[in-house]
Structures are given as structure tokens and as C-alpha cells.
Amino acid sequence: MNETRINVDPNEIAKFEQLAHRWWDQEGEFKPLHDINPLRLEYIRNHASLAGKRILDVGCGGGILTEELTRLGAKVTGIDLGKAPLSVARLHALEEGLEIDYQQISVERLAETKAGSFDVITNLEMLEHVPYPASVVAACGQLLKPGGKVFFSTLNRTPKAYLFAVIGAEYALRLLPKGTHDYHRFIRPAELETWCRKGGIELQNLTGLHYNPLTQRYRLGKDINVNYLAYGAKKE
């Protein structure tokens, strides 16, 4: 099985292609991404220096995180397999006067030619949308420089996550379009740690991301049973 060629779900690509024109609408379907972006950025900045670094944003979509990393002085490459989201990302970066290298390529394919090229890799809200997340993690390990850091955010495969992230977020509160997530693709931290270890990455931290429906605000915390962020470092 050649995961480099088939590690993509056409239904997932089609889903985000249809919504691509709404990517920068802060009150639209991607509102949760806009809302959590400051926390994601805070987490990354707390664990890695960014200015002047070469950063790869895997599954960059329309570029919400990518642009902020660029504004902090990093040289950023954003990759995605969706053509429409990348078109939106390129146009928005042009409007903002930002130089970002956007490419329509898989992380596995990029690793074939750019091994050891990046100081920092971000892989946020992406692993749960591909058939073979372990392949993505392995490619991240190949692309990192020794000592480089990789950041993940995904959903834990727990009953609480199903209740909050699927039933609550997609059906009750309608924070996300129905069908955004497939519970069976959620990832337990132990699974992520195993994939990282096999890829030469030492996982160093897990932090929960919590949503309060009463205040409609997000915060970082200790509970990793629903959404969580993680970072690891490639062995020197």
C-alpha cells in the first residue's frame, strides 16, 4: 500500500472545497477556527521560537494560522490538497501583503524532497480528516530538522468527545456543519504518542482545549478528553 499516493479522503476534500469561499468569514462555518486561533498561536509561541524560522503548516486550508505565523516573522510554507482553499489562501495573503509559499501537495510527497528542512511544523485540526494519520506524523518526522518541533491538535476518541464535538458542536449548538467529524477517526493521545515515537519525535506536552457554551469562549486546560493540543521535538 502506497500511503504517499492514497492518504486522502475525497469526501473530506469535497467538503472543504464547497465551503472554501467562506473561510475568512468570521461568523460563518469556520468561526470556531477563527475563535480558537489565538489560543493555538499562544500554545505554539509558548513552546517554540518563530521569528526567522522555517515553518510548515500542514493542512493549512484558507490560511488562518499560516498568516499569523508569517506575521510573527517566520518563513512559512502552507500545504493542502484542496485546490479551492489554497486559492482563497493565496488571494487573502496577497490582499494582506504577506509572502507565503502555498503548495497543493501531500506532506508525504513533500517529505520525499524536503527532508530535514523545517524548524517547526504545525498540523492542526487535520489528522482526524485523513485515512492514515500515522503516515502524516511519520512524514512530519522526516521533514523536521534535528531538534525541530511539531505541533498537533485533534480530537480524543472518547464518549465525552462524541457528546461534545459531534452531538453538541454539530447538532445541538450548530457550531460546525453536520458531518464535519467522523468519531471513528478521532485519535487517542496514546496512539499519537506511538506514531510520534516511531517517527523519531518525542512527545513532550498535551493540553486540552475547552469550550464554554454559556460564555461562548475557548480556553486551554488540563482535560484532554475532547479537543487537545500536543507538541513534540525531533530527536537530535
From Swiss-Prot:
InterPro entries assigned to the protein according to its UniProt record, in alphabetical order: Methyltransf_11 (IPR013216), SAM-dependent_MTases_sf (IPR029063), UbiG_MeTrfase (IPR010233)
GO MF assignments: 2-polyprenyl-6-hydroxyphenol methylase activity; 3-demethylubiquinol 3-O-methyltransferase activity; polyprenyldihydroxybenzoate methyltransferase activity
GO terms for biological process, alphabetical: methylation
E.C. designation(s): 2.1.1.222, 2.1.1.64
Family note: Belongs to the methyltransferase superfamily. UbiG/COQ3 family.
Protein name, as recorded: Ubiquinone biosynthesis O-methyltransferase
Superkingdom to which the source organism belongs: Bacteria
Presence of keyword Methyltransferase: yes
Residue stretches in coiled coil: none
Pathway: Cofactor biosynthesis; ubiquinone biosynthesis
Cited Pfam families: Methyltransf_11
Residues involved in S-adenosyl-L-methionine binding: 40, 59, 80, 124
Function: O-methyltransferase that catalyzes the 2 O-methylation steps in the ubiquinone biosynthetic pathway.
Catalysed reactions listed for this entry: a 3-demethylubiquinol + S-adenosyl-L-methionine = a ubiquinol + S-adenosyl-L-homocysteine + H(+); a 3-(all-trans-polyprenyl)benzene-1,2-diol + S-adenosyl-L-methionine = a 2-methoxy-6-(all-trans-polyprenyl)phenol + S-adenosyl-L-homocysteine + H(+)
Organism: Nitrosococcus oceani (strain ATCC 19707 / BCRC 17464 / JCM 30415 / NCIMB 11848 / C-107)
Keywords from the UniProt entry: Methyltransferase, S-adenosyl-L-methionine, Transferase, Ubiquinone biosynthesis
